[in-house]
């Protein structure tokens, strides 16, 4: 039986943290390699209309959002690792269930089948949201010493950020190689593997808190970070639109290269602590989109998306820092959950909008450009207002 003793580690990367990190990686890849490309796979063989295919993404993100209201109650009334285990297993089952709708002899025409498809996507979002929050916002933090928890938060977020690109790259590479339901079996297997890895880590028993409500925003959403969450959603929505309209391995790999460069640049204190880092990042992403508008050339699949990815990662990282700094120490899990909600919410809504506008690529990219402009304005206003308040209280 587990005891209340928690081992002390002098460094962040130990055996248990590494296992949980790998589990996070597998969980996110299992989702991001199957869900974002679901509209494409459904519409390619005329199994669903483009409108219905986009609704599957909307249903997924609604499931992610609604599941957050019950997260605090679940982890207070049941063992946290078992909540994750069951959620990850259910995610694998729903991923397998999606294959039944894609590979059919006849298109989906009956209304009951449309509702069933949307219900499966909603369930996928609900169990993924629960699993992701429990793992990155609770289990990873539980196995981390207090002095390392900020780094643990950043690690979890950066893993999610990279898998947003790694997942679609794997899907594009395996799409032609894995025919039929085998593609979904790979995604489900990754989800199952993440569940097994988490169960290999022992967690101390924690007595449940009293007075926990069934529906609550505790460990789900940070109200004081609503403006920051809006900016994050706008930024990631632009990313989702651009990924959808230019869904190639070369483009996604270049965006990921930009993410990696941003991760390295953020180790420089001058970059990490820059007051207008988010506005600068958005400006770089805007420049990249404008360069794509200007003319098509060899840099459209290399340099331009790398600059775009660098700007997006720089801006969203700055918003993460602001979100964590705006919360109390005991609210870090809530702040990270807020980031996850806004980041994935914006990303998948952008993907849905992008698939709906695939026949009008320029219009879709103009929408992405407008979203980044609005995000830049909000970022700049927030910085100026904060500076004005600091002078007023000085």
Q: What spans do the regions from the language model cover?
A:
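Hydrophobic core of transmembrane alpha-helices in multi-pass small-molecule transporters
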Residues: 25, 109-131, 300-315
């Amino acid at each position: 039986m587990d005891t209340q003793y928690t081992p002390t580690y002098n460094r962040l990367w130990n055996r248990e943290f590494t296992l949980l990190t790998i589990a996070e990686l597998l969980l996110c890849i299992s989702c991001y390699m199957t869900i974002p490309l679901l509209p494409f796979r459904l519409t390619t063989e005329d199994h669903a209309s483009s409108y219905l295919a986009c609704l599957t993404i909307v249903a997924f993100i609604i499931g992610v959002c609604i599941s957050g209201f019950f997260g605090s109650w679940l982890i207070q009334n049941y063992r946290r690792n078992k909540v994750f285990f069951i959620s990850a297993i259910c995610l694998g089952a729903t991923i397998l269930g999606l294959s039944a709708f894609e590979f059919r002899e006849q298109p989906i025409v009956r209304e009951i089948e449309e509702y069933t498809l949307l219900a499966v996507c909603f369930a996928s979002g609900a169990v993924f949201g629960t699993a992701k929050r429990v793992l990155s916002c609770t289990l990873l933090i539980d196995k981390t010493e207090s002095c390392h928890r900020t780094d643990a938060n950043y690690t979890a977020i950066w893993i999610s950020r990279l898998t947003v690109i790694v997942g679609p790259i794997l899907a594009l590479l395996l799409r032609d190689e894995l025919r039929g339901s085998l593609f979904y079996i790979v995604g489900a297997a990754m989800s199952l593997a993440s569940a097994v890895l988490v169960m290999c880590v022992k967690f101390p028993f924690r007595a449940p808190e009293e007075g926990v409500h069934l529906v609550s925003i505790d460990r789900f959403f940070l109200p004081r970070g609503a403006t920051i969450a809006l900016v994050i959603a706008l930024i990631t929505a632009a990313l989702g639109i651009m990924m959808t309209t230019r869904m190639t391995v070369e483009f996604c790999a270049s965006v990921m290269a930009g993410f990696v460069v941003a991760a390295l640049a953020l180790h420089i204190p001058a970059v990490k602590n820059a007051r207008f880092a988010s506005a600068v990042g958005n400006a770089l992403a805007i420049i990249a989109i404008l360069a794509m508008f200007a003319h098509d050339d060899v840099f459209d699949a290399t340099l331009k998306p790398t600059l775009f990815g660098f700007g997006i990662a720089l801006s969203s990282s700055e918003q993460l820092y602001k979100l964590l700094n705006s919360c109390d120490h005991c609210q870090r899990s809530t702040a990270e959950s807020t980031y996850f909600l806004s980041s994935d919410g914006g990303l998948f809504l952008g993907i849905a909008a992008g698939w709906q506008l695939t026949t009008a690529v320029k219009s879709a990219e103009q929408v992405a450009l407008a979203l980044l402009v609005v995000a830049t304005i909000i970022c700049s206003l927030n910085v100026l207002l904060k500076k004005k308040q600091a002078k007023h209280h000085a």
